[in-house]
Every structure is written in structure tokens, then in C-alpha cells.
Amino acid sequence: MASAASSLPLLVSSLLLALFALGAHADVKRYQFDIVMSNVSRLCHEKAMVTVNGSYPGPTIYAREGDRVIVNVTNHVKHNMTIHWHGLKQRRNGWADGPAYVTQCPIGSGGSYVYDFNVTRQRGTLWWHAHIAWMRATVHGAIVILPAAGVPYPFPKPDDEAEIVLGEWWHADVETVERQGSMLGMAPNMSDAHTINGKPGPLVPFCSEKHTYALQVQSGKTYLLRIINAAVNDELFFSIAGHNMTVVEIDATYTKPFAASTVQLSPGQTMNVLVSADQSPGRYFMVAKPFNDVPIPADNKTATAILQYAGVPTSVVPALPQTMPATNSTGSVAAFHDKLRSLNSPRYPADVPLAVDRHLLYTIGLNIDPCETCLNRSRLAASLNNITFVMPRTALLQAHYYGQKGVFAADFPDRPPARFNYTGVPLTAGLGTSLGTRLSKIAYNATVELVLQDTNLLSVESHPFHLHGYNFFVVGRGVGNFDPAKDPAKYNLVDPPERNTVGVPAGGWTAIRFRADNPGVWFLHCHLEVHTSWGLKMAFLVEDGSGPDESVLPPPKDLPKC
């Protein structure tokens, strides 16, 4: 079923890690990303799609903590392009962050741009992806940041490791799918399959037998799997038949280890797990299936890959996991996330802000706005504090840096315009929003608490939110309406999970805290691309401080122009 070539990514990873061990003194890593059209075939369908260097998923970036990374991106396709280095903090250097019209204008057809950044006090698994329209469906890849030379993992050293990139596949051109949905004012068509390392696996009908990723393992050895949810619109469960996983890291921050038979990741999140090849030699399915906790149409397609013990014939039928959570199992997801704790060791402390300077409450809404050219003369929209974000025509960071007027207003409200029973009966009237390019101005070094509150406008739904430029601590979460008088007493201020992307439960809330010590303009958005395209986003404008290293760096000379 799986060819020997399917194990090449693990071999390449092992060789690169060995080279890093030999050349630990190297501190500059250079990469060339060519944005090209490639013909790719899955499920009996071939299509031309945008890729980096002709590969899907794209190449892995390898670096060490403390390295400088230089990536020259050359755009050979007709589409505009940007690349976001998801989870890298880019201190003072928003010019390298990548979201189109937020920190940079796009790289036009035939153009190039050099992303030049330092990996400072970060180590673990992150990822990169296109950050314009829905291009990230095919333009994405892993980032592996090894600990600084001589610094061990804070868990047993694995014998080997591999990246596991979870994604989605559309037969149609993804940009066409998004554009058709936008023109109609409706939700775009769902994907045709989920993938593991770009392949749907043999359980999906239609020519999928040869499109199966296989990870070869040796009995008795332990492997570090670097799992990335690169799906466009789906939260996913991941499980390996017959094998437990030990969670040791989320979003490139170490955790207190714990065992799990199934893990759950929202789009944008990463997770490192240890897996021991301690079962009877055989072939075992790795499974990725959607988590969906609301009664609306959703993907329910399962992707599979194979954990292949060395020496076992490929004719052996792989075993499936005996039990996995139901697609709508909110209880198992909540129980899993309750186990996530920062390592909080002397080397890796959890520096949770205990005092708060700014308290923010953002309500998450799914809305309906008028649209004379759309089906039913209306379009689906989304909002924070009832504001649907409008993307500007020039980059926000450039407008801020150069003092350009009329691009944005720095008046995003700290609270919703009206209080109501956010998670009560579904609200079907008064669903319109206000439109605006509105930012929230934050003083340098201020401590911020942001409560993200889901609402029942149209329907409750879980939302993964990603904050650029920062990690944050997830100090609390709950079901129902956030109670500012009672809920903070239940916060975990000792060892809460530290993340860059967090899920807000359907009909519930999530509270995060961070210190605004990174000046610039930083995007906050839902990482379900369908919701982001509807306007579920905003940005923080973190002011410069007074110190010599507390202001935005000057822009690079090759920064693209709008």
C-alpha cells in the first residue's frame, strides 16, 4: 500500500538533524522559496496549484534557537503572495511577519522579498504558510527549531523524529472556491478530503491507495512526532492505532508531559508527542478526523497514514484505532485541554502576568450583512464586538510607521457595544454589523487580559484565534457567558498553557493574558479561513517604548509596495 519512498521525509529529517549536530556553530540559515505552479494529483484528480519549490506540503525550515533565518521568496505565479512564519514572535520586526496588508504589501507576480528574522528564545515546532486569501491551503510547511547547542530536551531524548502535517484537499482551485462563496454571500464548498503530509490515505475512495504516507519505525525505539494542523477550516483529532502518545509541547512551548490516546488540534496549532514503538510489529493506522461541535454542515472525512514497523510486509492490513472520540465530543476535547499545563521549570518558567493593565472583552459573532449582488441579497459575515474588519489597501504597519493618515482608526472598543445573553437562544434578528479598519492601541509593556466570548448570533461555534507577534497564557476557559465577578477566581495563574493559537469553545469563552512588549501592528484573527474572509479579525497597535530596543525597526529596503 505505501511505497518505500513514503519514508523518505523521516530519513531526510534524520540526516538534517545529524548535520545540525555536526555544525552547531552555524548561526545563519538561508532558504530559497520559489512560488510556482505545480501539477498535483490526488483522488483521480490532477490540478495545477500554487506551491513552494514544487512540493506539497512545502519544504521544512530547520534552525536552532538563537539562529538568524533568511528566506528569499520569489513569486513566479500570477497571484500575489506573502509568507507568515506562524508563531515566531518577530520582536520589533513586524516587517518579517507576513500577513498581507497588515505588516506588508504582497509580493506581486515576478517580485521577490527577503524575510530576515532571528529565532530568539523559541524552540520547538512551528510552521509557515501563505497569508493572503486562501493560498495557505497549498502553500505551507513545517518549522523545526532545535534547542540551542548543548541544551537537551526537557523530556527523554527520542531516537528519531518526523513532521506530521495535517491538511485539506480540494479538487477545484481553492481561490475559485473562495471567490464563488464570496460572490454568492454563502459559505464556500467544503474540502474533498483531509490529508496527512499531503496524502489522504487508503480509506478515501478513488485512487488514494498510492497517496499514503508511511512512517517506518523500529521496535523498541521512541519517536518525536511534530504535528501541525495546517487545515484551512477544520479542527482535527489525531490518533495512532494501538499506541499512546505523550504530549510534551504545544505551539513551541514545553508542557508537563501526559499520556493521551487521541489529541486535538485547531487550525494553526502545533503539538509534539512522543510515541514508542512498543506494540507487536505490524502496521497501524494514524488517523486524522474532524472535530465539529455544532449542528451545521461540516466535513466528516477521515485521513489516514501508516505507522510501519520495519520488516513487516506492506501486504499486512493496518489496524484502525479501536476507539476515537465522536465528531461532536466536546467533553473529550475539554478534558484533553484541561490536562495542558506549561512546564514552568527554572529554565522554562511560566511568566504569567498577575496584575492586569487592560481588560478586554471581545464578542465573536456570525452575522448577516446586506448585499444586493449576492444570493438572497445578503452575505454571511463575522465580527468582533460587532465590527467586521475591512482590509486596507496599504499595509497597516507601514501606515503606522510613516504616520500615514486615513488608513485605519485606533479606536477598536474594549467591550461590545451592548451586553446581552451572549450564549442564550439563537438570535436571528438584528444580525448586521458595522464595517471598519479599526485597531486597538496598547501601551508598550502593558499587561493585557483578553476574554474571547462566543455568541449565539446565528449559531454558537468553536473558533481558534491566533495572535501574531506574541505568545499568551490561556488562564481560563468555560461554557456559557463569562462572569467577570466569579470566573477570574478559577483562573490558573501558576502553570497555564502558553500558546499562540487558542480555541474558544462553542457557546463559551477563553481568557488569555500577555505582556505587550513587542511594538508594532499585530494581527488577531480566527484561524478558520472561512471566518477570517468574512471579517473575523482585528489588529493591535502596540506603541513604541522609551528604551533603545523598544521601538519598531526600520523597514527593509526591498519591502514590497502596494
From Swiss-Prot:
Domain named Plastocyanin-like: residues: 34-150, 160-312, 411-546
User: GO cellular component terms?
Assistant: apoplast
Segment forming the signal sequence: 1-26
Reading the lineage from the top rank, the first entry is: Eukaryota
> What is written in the cofactor note of this entry?
Binds 4 Cu cations per monomer.
Any GO BP annotation: lignin catabolic process
Q: Which residues bind Cu cation 1?
A: 84, 466
Extract one GO molecular function annotation from the record: hydroquinone:oxygen oxidoreductase activity
Instruction: Name the cofactor(s) required for activity, per the record.
Output: Cu cation
Enumerate the residues binding Cu cation 4: 463, 526, 531
Where Cu cation 2 binds, per the record, is at 86, 129, 527
Q: Which InterPro entries match?
A: Cu-oxidase-like_N, Cu-oxidase_2nd, Cu-oxidase_C, Cu-oxidase_fam, Cu_oxidase_CS, Cu_oxidase_Cu_BS, Cupredoxin, CuRO_1_LCC
The record lists Cu cation 3 as bound by 131, 468, 525
Q: Which PANTHER family match?
A: LACCASE-2 (PTHR11709:SF452), MULTI-COPPER OXIDASE (PTHR11709)
Q: What is this protein called?
A: Laccase-2
Taxonomic source organism: Oryza sativa subsp. japonica
